[in-house]
Structure formats: structure tokens, C-alpha cells
Design a protein with these regions (language model features):
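Amphipathic/hydrophobic helical signal segments and adjacent flexible N-terminal regions
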Residues: 1-84, 165-166
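Contiguous, well-ordered beta-strand patches that form the walls/edges
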Residues: 58-61, 86-146
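A broad, low-specificity signal marking well-ordered, structured residues that form hydrophobic/aromatic
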Residues: 76, 85, 130, 160
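Short, exposed beta-strand-loop hairpins at the edges of beta-sheets
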Residues: 149-157
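Edge beta-strands of extracellular beta-sandwich domains
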Residues: 159-165
Length: 166
């Protein structure tokens, strides 16, 4: 059975070894070409998270992260169409075909940590927040807008504030 996908673009996946020059750190790789069209409408009630974002503030376990923490180098692009969200960053392309809260229509890809460990994630929008729930893990990953910034919260591990760079 084919998964429902918002937009005419086929489901995108992380290539073997991650996207870009695999001899470079996952934070130094050039983002691949945009997958979705800029002119595709969002579904009713879906917040606009689109753009390319760079970490500007970082708390780890509630404390300001040291300058050498790897997440300071993180940048990502979020693409949206209808109820579909694609997060491209850190070497991975995470395409949520439909953010309807089901694993079936969620992400089926690999983890950024090694580009090989399978990852399934259900996602949905709750009161303007994109809430992602990885299968078999007791965590939630959230993204939402606060003014001009994007907030990225990874359970209790870290909270990053990102500024739009494109």
C-alpha cells in the first residue's frame, strides 16, 4: 500500500552515508536541492516552519552549552506542503509524508548519528507545535515558532533556538 504524501514530490530519503560530501562532518555538508515547491499551500492549522535555520542559542540539560558543543554547528532546512514536513540537516533527509500522528504515514529513514540505524517517527501538530515521537523511544522532539525564531526541543536533552538564515 502506498503512503499518502502531500505534494506531488515522491518521498525523500537519506542517501547512504548521508547527503553531501561524506568526507566532511555532517555539520559541514552542503544541503541538497530543495525537494518541495515553494508555492505549495499548507493545510489548515499547520504553522509555517519553512526556511533554513541556524542554531543561535543552546541549552543542554537546562544549562548554556559550551562553545565546543557540536550542535552549535547545526543548521537545517524545513520544507512543508499540506500536512507534509521535510527536515533536512546534519546529513539526513527526514520526510514526514503526513503529520497525522501515525507511524504508518510518518518518517521511515535512518538516524543522523550513523546514517544506518533505522528510525520510524510519528508526527503531528499540537497547538502550533510539530511533535515527533520516535517509535520505541521515550522521547518527544518538538519544533515551533516563537516570534522570528524556531525552537527545537529534544525531550529533556537540549533546547535550541534557531535564527532564519534563508
Amino acid at each position: 500500500m502506498e503512503r499518502p504524501v502531500s505534494s506531488s514530490a515522491p518521498t525523500a530519503f537519506t542517501p547512504a552515508g548521508g547527503y553531501g560530501d561524506t568526507s566532511r562532518s555532517r555539520y559541514e555538508r552542503e544541503l541538497p536541492a530543495q525537494i518541495l515547491s515553494d508555492d505549495e499551500a499548507l493545510a489548515d492549522g499547520v504553522p509555517d516552519l519553512r526556511g533554513t535555520w541556524k542554531v543561535a542559542a543552546l541549552l543542554v540539560n537546562g544549562v548554556a552549552a559550551p562553545a565546543d558543543h557540536h550542535l552549535w554547528a547545526h543548521f537545517e532546512r524545513i520544507e512543508q506542503s499540506g500536512n507534509r514536513v521535510i527536515v533536512v540537516g546534519g546529513g539526513v533527509i527526514h520526510d514526514f509524508a503526513s503529520c497525522d500522528g501515525t507511524l504508518e504515514n510518518g518518517l521511515h529513514d535512518v538516524m543522523a548519528i550513523d546514517f544506518t540505524t533505522p528510525l520510524q517517527v510519528a508526527a503531528r501538530f499540537d497547538d502550533g507545535v510539530l511533535v515527533m515521537r520516535p517509535h520505541g523511544m521515550p522521547v518527544e522532539v518538538k519544533r515551533w515558532r516563537e516570534g522570528e525564531q524556531l525552537v527545537w526541543e529534544y525531550s529533556i536533552a537540549f533546547t535550541a533556538r534557531l535564527n532564519r538564515i534563508a
